[in-house]
């Protein structure tokens, strides 16, 4: 829940930064982006990726997120249609999908910093505000100012270090394996 709010907060920062650079973003587009960031991990089961294949053996969490968003869209009389188009990369302005899901997206900007803080590992402490301030749109695609090269390198290195230090750490693997065995035994 905190991650969804954090990712949405970064979306508000990105919209503000891009509008400041004269990128035309309507209020409907901004709201759709915010909805995407709030709902992007809706398809995750408990314990995130660790039990994804246990609960949804035939679908990824992204597939489940889309299915749940479509159900919500029906309940909300189509108010999430634009958000679903952005989420599934079916919207004409591709930079919105890039903000939601790409190599440097708002999701990653939030979870790297958040996971770094809560794990006590400093490698993931990135300057997301600076990266967002360096975002630009060219031909409806997300690009970065040339001055962002160092920040992008730091982000990519931080992501790799977080995988080595936290996500792929032996303790994480053991904890995931214990969870999987518990659920296998219970079923």
How should each PLM-predicted stretch be described?
Residues 1-35, 43-187:
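Sequence-structural signature of the catalytic-core scaffold of metal-dependent phosphohydrolases
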